[in-house]
């Protein structure tokens, strides 16, 4: 029995430090809630991060604008190329119009002159030089055409106007016609002249140039009478002698 009591006593002694240890550990359990300050620290860090992001956000906007400008760059270059091409086309069209329009109007004017004279001759057998662009020197009237025809076609066209192909029969008439720089068929042929005086006839023969075998028709170029093929196309002038 004494031995058992001794064991119980020792057991009680061992229980005492265990309870003391529990009692000593208990204050740490009460101090553990102090560790809960970490969320406060995190919230301060979050505030700093928010402030940093708030200061950085305005700097991102220019980058977006530069990206937009870079994206718009190729489109503006394409539009520049298109405008340059359109400008070149407009210049080319203006040049072509400036060249073609005068030719068109001159051709229409000549056709109108021929048709008006043709209708006039149908209505009246006599030619009225005052109603058209005839040029008068004394009793002679001249009408010049820019359209090209052969010698025979020019002669028949003048006959339809109740006139004849240009016939230079005097030196004074030639000097008057030199003022207009005429370049076209005349009525005289090879070995044929209407000049009355022998002096004028020799002058006509000396002014003939480029004479060939098949060139039996004459045309006037400035003050020169040139022999050429009758089938070649040249301008012509009609003459009307008013009595």
From Swiss-Prot:
The keyword Cell inner membrane does not apply. It is found in: Cell membrane. A motif (ITIM motif 2) lies at residues 47-52. Glycans are attached at residues 123, 191, 194, 200, 214. SMART domains: CLECT (SM00034). One of its GO terms (biological process) is stimulatory C-type lectin receptor signaling pathway. The chain crosses the membrane at residues 81-101. Residues 137-239 form the C-type lectin domain. GO terms for cellular component: external side of plasma membrane; plasma membrane. A motif (ITIM motif 1) lies at residues 16-21. Residues 1-80 are cytoplasmic. GO terms for molecular function: carbohydrate binding; transmembrane signaling receptor activity. SUPFAM superfamilies: C-type lectin-like. It is a single-pass type II membrane protein. Keywords: Cell membrane, Disulfide bond, Glycoprotein, Lectin, Membrane, Receptor, Signal-anchor, Transmembrane, Transmembrane helix. InterPro entries: C-type_lectin-like (IPR001304), C-type_lectin-like/link_sf (IPR016186), CTDL_fold (IPR016187), NKG2/CD94_NK_receptors (IPR050919), NKR-like_CTLD (IPR033992). Residues 102-243 are extracellular. Expressed in natural killer (NK) cells. PROSITE patterns: C_TYPE_LECTIN_2. Disulfide bonds join 158-238, 217-230. Lectin-like receptor for natural killer (NK) cells. Heterodimer formation with KLRE1 mediates inhibition of NK cell cytolytic activity. Contains 2 copies of a cytoplasmic motif that is referred to as the immunoreceptor tyrosine-based inhibitor motif (ITIM). The phosphorylated ITIM motif can bind the SH2 domain of several SH2-containing phosphatases leading to down-regulation of cell activation. Heterodimer with KLRE1. Interacts with PTPN6. This is Killer cell lectin-like receptor subfamily I member 1. The gene is Klri1.
């Amino acid at each position: 029995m004494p031995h058992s009591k001794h064991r119980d006593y020792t057991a009680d002694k061992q229980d005492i430090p265990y309870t003391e240890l529990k009692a000593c550990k208990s204050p740490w359990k009460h101090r553990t809630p102090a560790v809960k300050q970490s969320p406060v620290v995190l919230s301060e860090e979050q505030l700093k991060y928010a402030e940093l992001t708030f200061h950085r956000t305005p700097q991102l906007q220019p980058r977006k604008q530069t990206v937009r400008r870079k994206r718009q760059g190729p489109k503006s270059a394409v539009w520049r190329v298109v405008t340059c091409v359109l400008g070149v086309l407009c210049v080319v069209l203006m040049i072509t119009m400036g060249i073609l329009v005068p030719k068109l109007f001159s051709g229409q004017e000549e056709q109108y002159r021929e048709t008006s004279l043709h209708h006039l001759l149908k209505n009246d057998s006599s030619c009225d030089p005052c109603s058209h662009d005839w040029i008068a020197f004394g009793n002679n009237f001249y009408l010049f055409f820019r359209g090209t025809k052969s010698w025979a076609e020019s002669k028949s066209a003048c006959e339809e106007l109740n006139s004849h192909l240009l016939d230079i029969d005097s030196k004074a008439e030639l000097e008057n016609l030199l003022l207009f720089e005429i370049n076209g068929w005349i009525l005289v042929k090879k070995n044929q002249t209407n000049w009355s005086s022998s002096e004028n006839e020799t002058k006509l023969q000396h002014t003939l140039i480029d004479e060939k075998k098949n060139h039996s028709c004459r045309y006037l170029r400035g003050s020169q009478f040139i022999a050429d093929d009758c089938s070649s196309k040249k301008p012509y002038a009609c003459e009307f002698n008013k009595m």
